[in-house]
Design a protein with these regions (language model features):
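N-proximal helix/coil linker or "cap" segments that precede and/or mark the start of modular domains
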Residues: 4-37
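Thiol-/selenol-based redox modules, centered on thioredoxin-like
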Residues: 138-176
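A short beta-strand-turn-helix
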Residues: 29-32, 38-57
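Structural microenvironment flanking redox-active thiols in thiol-disulfide oxidoreductases
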Residues: 67-112, 121-124
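Structural micro-motif
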Residues: 112-114, 132-143
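Short active-site neighborhood of thiol/selenol oxidoreductases, capturing the structured segment around
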Residues: 51-72
Length: 176
C-alpha cells in the first residue's frame, strides 16, 4: 500500500511539473562549456567528427525517431531554413538512436539534405544529457555550438514547429 502511494505521488509530481522536468538539468552540458566530442555515422555511412566543424557554427539537434510526426516537422523546418544557416556558416546535425538505414530512408522520403547521425548505442545522446525518460530514444534537445566548440545556447524539450526560427534568431543575436 505504501509503495503504491509513493508511486502515485511520484507520478502526480511528474505530471504537474511537465515533461521538461523529466530531464535532469545537471546531465545537460551547460552554456559556456566545451561541447562533448563525438564521431558518428551519417545517413551515407560516413564518419562525422564534431572536430571537423571547428571554424563554423553547429546546430546539434537530438530528436526521438525518424519518420514520426514531430520529428518530421522539425526536420522539414531545418531543411526549409538551411540556406539561412549556411549563409551564417552554420551546419545542422540531427542525432537520434535510429540506424543509418533508417536515416537514409527518412532523408530520401522527406528530401532532407543535411546530415542525420546514428547513435544506436546512445553514447552521444547520453553525453549531451538527451536520453528521454520515456523510453530508449533521444529527447528533443538542441545545442548551438560556436566555431570554437563552445556550447552557446541550450534548448531542452523543444516544440518542433517554431524551433528552427528560434535557433536562427539566437544565432543572429550571438553573431553580433
Amino acid at each position: 500500500m505504501k509503495q503504491t502511494l509513493n508511486i502515485a505521488v511520484a507520478a502526480l509530481a511528474v505530471c504537474l511539473a511537465g515533461p521538461a522536468s523529466l530531464l535532469r538539468a545537471a546531465d545537460v552540458p551547460a552554456e559556456g562549456s566545451t561541447a562533448p566530442e563525438f564521431k558518428l555515422q551519417s545517413q551515407e555511412g560516413k564518419t562525422v567528427d564534431l572536430k571537423d566543424f571547428r571554424g563554423q557554427w553547429v546546430v546539434l539537434y537530438f530528436y526521438p525517431k525518424d519518420m514520426t510526426q514531430g520529428c518530421t516537422i522539425e526536420a522539414h523546418n531545418f531543411q526549409r531554413d538551411l540556406a539561412q544557416y549556411q549563409a551564417k556558416k552554420a551546419a545542422i546535425l540531427g542525432v537520434s538512436a535510429d540506424t543509418t538505414d533508417s536515416h537514409q530512408q527518412f532523408c530520401t522520403k522527406e528530401s532532407l539534405t543535411f546530415k542525420l547521425l546514428a547513435d544506436p548505442d546512445k553514447n552521444v545522446i547520453n553525453a549531451y544529457g538527451s536520453l528521454s525518460p520515456r523510453g530508449p530514444v533521444a529527447a528533443r534537445n538542441t545545442f548551438l555550438i560556436d566555431p570554437k566548440g563552445v556550447i552557446r545556447k541550450v534548448y531542452v524539450g523543444v516544440k518542433p514547429d517554431p524551433h528552427s526560427a528560434e535557433v536562427l534568431a539566437a544565432l543572429a543575436e550571438l553573431e553580433k
